[in-house]
From Swiss-Prot:
Record family assignment: Belongs to the bacterial/plant glucose-1-phosphate adenylyltransferase family.
Binding residues for alpha-D-glucose 1-phosphate: 99, 164, 179-180, 197
Name the record gives this protein: Glucose-1-phosphate adenylyltransferase
Enzyme class, spelled out: transferase
Organismal lineage: Bacteria, Bacillati, Actinomycetota, Actinomycetes, Mycobacteriales
Length: 404
């Protein structure tokens, strides 16, 4: 039996998420609720824990209270075997300053690396929706002999300009790392596809520490993992690509195998929710062999009374639909939809209240939003733009705790 290497996980969770405003007005992007029972960070933590990586540092900064509380309440490990998932806010160990970039966040947290003394470090982002077995990527990294391995997902070349792109040779060595290029490179085996960076990296520890320290002395650097550290290691010939399509997750269906979504905009966030609601969803939340763990509350089951109806929808615990209709929507816990109301193609976060006869279409309602009797949202976008945020795709977004 192959012995397991000593691996430390670092999750970069300090993102502000400006493009998700107003959902990030009061919380860090990784703390944004998703899918009726989760927060965005639950996907990366579930992937790491399912793979057996149980020593994880979550680097936080921007409005981190919700995130810190969620980790402490939802992600408690036994600790008997040195297991931990711990949020790490900026410690100001190098002076009176906060993190200036993702690489600087790791620089300021190198004491954690020295304490753990791992052979390898996985550095993953905290705000994507996907399933992945990181252990397979770690083994690929070890076998490649590279200093860093970058996870790449194949996207159509015509769409790749929106991503950090990887140009690699047939051996998997990265020859260029390009940030949102006008002319993305093809993959070695398909000129019509491009490797887009998933923001997930595996490092040999010494390579990461040396690169982080060298970057800290460069006054021209933005101290960013994708923008500075990876390009420097590519130039040094130390980087390889890991093809995400080779990652085999137990229980994955043909339909959702290889699913990965960057939900950094309101439209992308909305579209990812719509991926969940069909009979055969593009992303299956119900894979018991690779579960996504989320908040567990002591709530009663959802209830449908007086003809309340939900079609093609995800409905969380504690919801009550009373003579109301919900279609193609995702309802988080404790949502109440009153008589005669209609909710279509919408995302309702915990504690939302929809009044009698109200209509909500193509909208995202943050926690504890109250929609009054007879209110109409998502039908007249010109009117909605005067009151709320409306995305380029016409999705109405209403911030936390708003009464309408």
């Amino acid at each position: 039996m192959r012995s397991q290497p000593h691996v430390l996980g670092i999750v970069l969770a300090g993102g502000e998420g400006k493009r998700l405003y107003p959902l990030t007005a009061d919380r860090a992007k990784p703390a944004v609720p998703f899918g009726g029972a989760y927060r965005l960070i639950d996907f990366v933590l579930s992937n790491l824990v399912n793979a057996g990586y149980l020593r994880l540092c979550v680097l936080t900064q921007y409005k981190s209270h919700s995130l810190d509380r969620h980790i402490s309440q939802t992600w408690r490990l036994s600790g008997f075997a040195g297991e931990y998932i711990t949020p790490v806010p900026a410690q100001q160990r190098l002076g009176p300053r906060w993190y200036t970039g993702s690489a600087d966040a790791i620089l300021q947290s190198l004491n954690l690396v020295y304490d753990e003394d791992p052979e390898y470090i996985v550095v993953f982002g905290a705000d994507h929706v996907y399933r992945m077995d990181p252990e397979q990527m770690v083994q690929h990294h070890i076998e490649s002999g590279a200093g860093v391995t970058v996870a790449g997902i194949r996207v159509p070349r015509s769409e790749a300009f929106a991503f950090g792109c990887i140009d690699s040779d047939e051996s998997g060595r990265i020859v260029q790392f390009l940030e949102k290029p006008a002319h993305p490179p093809g993959t070695p085996d398909d000129p019509n596809m491009t490797f887009a960076s998933m923001g997930n990296y595996v490092f040999t520890t010494k390579v990461l520490v040396d690169a982080i320290r060298a970057d800290s002395e460069n006054s021209d650097s933005d101290h960013d993992m994708g923008g500075d550290i990876i390009p420097a290691l590519v130039e040094a010939g130390e980087a390889s690509v890991y093809d995400f399509k080779d990652n085999v997750v137990p229980g994955a269906t043909d339909r959702d195998r290889g699913y990965w979504r960057d939900v950094g905009t309101l439209d992308a966030f909305y579209d990812a929710h719509m991926d969940l609601v069909s009979v055969h969803p593009i992303f299956n939340l119900y894979n018991r062999r690779w579960p996504i763990r989320g908040e567990t509350e002591n709530l009663a089951p959802a209830k449908f009374v007086q003809g309340g109806l939900a079609q093609e929808s995800v409905v969380g615990a504690g919801c009550i639909l009373s003579a109301a209709t919900v279609r193609n929507s995702v309802l988080s816990s404790n949502v109440m939809v009153d008589s005669g109301a209609t909710v279509e193609g919408s995302v309702l976060m915990p504690g939302v209240r929809i009044g009698k006869g109200a209509v909500v279409r193509r909208a995202i309602l943050d926690k504890n939003v109250v929609v009054g009797d007879g209110e109409i949202i998502g039908v007249d976008l010109e009117r909605d733009k005067q009151r709320f945020a409306v995305s380029n795709g016409g999705v109405v977004a209403i911030g936390k705790g708003v009464w309408i």
